[in-house]
């Protein structure tokens, strides 16, 4: 028996050697964890809309970028994991454009049924099409490596690939919302300031504490022909009319107080299922998630089974698991945006973005409050936000964008909404590109290059308040028809009742620029009309609807750019097919010497004529 056992051991050993030789991995010749080192000009932590816009804008301006996102999808609060609606400045003429508009138009083109999972991929596509971006999904920042006062690298862990990353960079952008790069020692705040610290009259007596606005788990409903009762899990709350039976506080001046709990199905995304403001929205995140689940199931059970039949034709289609956050950490920058900045319209020399949502200050007690859930103060139509809100006052190579910018609690109550944070992300990413270009710091960009930053943002279709874009020199030196002169006013949208555009009939009309002498033209910049005024960009609150959305009908679909050479002939120098974007920045294959340039529209997405806001020769 001993010889048999010895023979078996020998055979097993030989088999193992053969298996390893053939490529089988075992504990002897493989790893459980992996280590990888990466390096880029700009490292962006956080892949919500602010982080996406920051990464893409920096990449398009020539930087190598690493985007680190701890979730499997991009989009943050707007993603399919959370499904919060994107809102921003009030009024059609104030609609946020730039990269956010590009993403939303891509969604219209490739997601006509407005499904949330496909919306995720509209955001994803915007990132992965940029060759300068390395995207790390499912990757959480765990620590920072410092070099004196500066951040030298991030340490991160990828849960899918079991990989430890050391990510080196020259500039670091925190778009996480929760401010993980505070590990650098950057100054920050959590909670509500006293009213007298910044003279914020709307704070009242509710300041000087660590309370914040809460988190929310959302619901999505589906219309149905049949009515079936709903039973919530045993661990959920079970509400009755008494839980919703209290007086709505009346309006007051200067704020309007609302309860907002609306247990009815119409036009409802259930943002008011909110909790966590009285505790810590970071440290207590798991407890908050469970409490919100208990509330969400209880709310739906109450609504669905209500004797008045308010939800008899609805079923619960989706309930969130990941809460959306409104507030946690606010970094401290050279400027702290306050209530007074917002209400005085934010006339800053270093303006780089704008807001326009109300000062929407949620009660930390949130859903469990029997009083008001929010106090909204009407703000100016739009207000400027300065560059000094986007970089650290004490860590020289740290910038930030999103809900962790430098602001008071009251200031953040307006700037935290996602259309605004997308603009802030684009501004931060563009500013980061200038930091890399000049080998300097955000503070020095603020001091020496703010005008260049503002021009770049406007050129990228990010409107800035209290100023208009400067058309190109070539455009201004050309002659054109009186009707086309509006294209060189720098106002790339309808504004205060003025159209600011021209109508072009496909196959019949064109926009023509002429020069007295031949000029060298290397490209063109065009702003088509994406119909801010006629549509909503928000995802649907009801799931499984079959109504399709379309690319805006007056958008130019197919077009040509033609140049007239010295021979007097029109030559096509660029042809665009299937266009669905508002901003087109076009580089010709090679510069052309011409004494005329024209934009020819071949087709639209359904309208009889295309509407164009700008056509610049470059």
Predicted regions mapped to residue ranges:
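Aromatic, loop-rich ligand-recognition surfaces of beta-strand-rich domains
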Residues: 495-572, 577-618
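Predominantly extracellular/luminal regions of secreted and cell-surface proteins
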Residues: 469-493
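Bacterial Sec-dependent N-terminal signal peptides
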Residues: 1-17
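Flavin (FAD/FMN)-binding glycine-rich loop and adjacent Rossmann-like elements that form
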Residues: 18-22, 29, 153, 160-473
